[in-house]
Amino acid sequence: MANGLKGIKTVRDFELAGKVVFLRLDLNVPMENGKITDENRITASLPTIKYCMEQGAKLVMASHLGRPKTKDDTEFSLEPVAKRLQDLLNAEVILVEEPDSDAPKHLLPSLKPHQLILLENVRFEEGETKDSVEFAQKIANYSDIYINDAFGASHRAHATIHALPSVMKDKGIGFLIEKEITMLDSLLQNPKRPYIAVMGGAKVSDKIAVIERLMDVVDGFIVGGAMAYTFLKAQGLPVGKSLVENDKLKYAKEMIERIEARNKTILLPVDHVATKGITDTAHAHVTNDVAIAEDELGVDIGPKSIKNFSAALREAGTIFWNGPMGIFENPAFAKGTFGVAQAIADSEAIKIVGGGDSAAAAEASGFAGKMTHISTGGGASLEYLQGDKLPGLEILRTRIR
């Protein structure tokens, strides 16, 4: 078992038959007009749900969805999720509209084997984001076992993630968190070499802690996306109007020096797709070299950069990908991200994708199925990799006497 799971029980460690299992999931899926647009987080939760059902547990499930301000924000209702779960599980999912009520307590005695309870969006309750012990105790009163399988929310000290397991004796994790931590630990402990971290996205500042943690573990970095312009400017190269964090120029310069001093590699773009504005596809063109004209900004990496990055990725034994290479949501600026996604997919390496934008980029590229693991964690996976303790996991190591 991976190191990060030391002292934490899994759902397999409990006798579930006839027991009320409170299962905290991350069903925070994107929606448009009440329709689910990406159900990955739902399907990722199914193995634990099915296992609990097969073992004869009575299930009370819970999740958050978005950031509702009040209970009247019905666009954040879990109703579409409940309907989708019914289809996927071939079971009746009873949606309890008041998570803070005694309704589950009254429903549980007569719950049939193919019926499950899903609490409405827990963030409709004020006590959830306040880590309220009072709200948690209400749930604990009718629950025998607590299982957290919401990796994407485990970095938040919220009531159903933190306060609830703090008042329950029997607690552990589901299969999704077990897999997530095992995969992320493999990036920190004895990775197959060469090990390359592909970093992209907008800001260097968002990635500093992860870069620092990985610097002693990886063999090389590939840096693309808008954050690359800060590194290029730090080397005195012209980046035009591209997004640059001027307060991070010194850090970027020092980081390059530190990487090279450790005999590790850092690959930066050598050409770009540049244009006059981020929505301006008409003037988009590939630069001849690394320089970007004064009145232009970079929106993607160019073909020479894709070729360089792909050649390095072909040789890799382990790849961690976090962040797109350009504004991939615009098809005109997606070639860099999709080219790198293809190179990662074609590689024989262990390929782990972490961070929300990278997961979306992997999906959009059509290569998601070829990745070893795409983390459902977003912010949680980065916080874990940078060495932060996740409240939702740490509380599971504590024992109630």
Swiss-Prot record:
GO cellular component: cytosol
Catalyzed reactions per annotation: (2R)-3-phosphoglycerate + ATP = (2R)-3-phospho-glyceroyl phosphate + ADP
Broad class of where this protein is predominantly found: cytoplasm
UniProt entry tagged with the keyword Transferase: yes
EC number: 2.7.2.3
Pathway info: Carbohydrate degradation; glycolysis; pyruvate from D-glyceraldehyde 3-phosphate: step 2/5
List of residues binding substrate: D26, L27, N28, R41, H64, L65, G66, R67, R123, R156
Enzyme class: transferase
Keywords: ATP-binding, Cytoplasm, Glycolysis, Kinase, Nucleotide-binding, Transferase
Residues binding ATP, per UniProt: K207, G298, E329, G355, G356, D357, S358
PROSITE patterns recorded: PGLYCERATE_KINASE
Entries under Gene3D superfamilies matching the protein: Phosphoglycerate kinase, N-terminal domain
Gene Ontology terms: biological process: gluconeogenesis; glycolytic process
One Pfam family cited in the UniProt record for this chain: PGK
GO molecular function: ADP binding; ATP binding; phosphoglycerate kinase activity
Subcellular location as annotated: Cytoplasm
The family this protein is said to belong to: Belongs to the phosphoglycerate kinase family.
Subunit structure: Monomer.
The protein, known as: Phosphoglycerate kinase
Organism the protein comes from: Bdellovibrio bacteriovorus (strain ATCC 15356 / DSM 50701 / NCIMB 9529 / HD100)
Name of the gene encoding the protein in the UniProt record: pgk
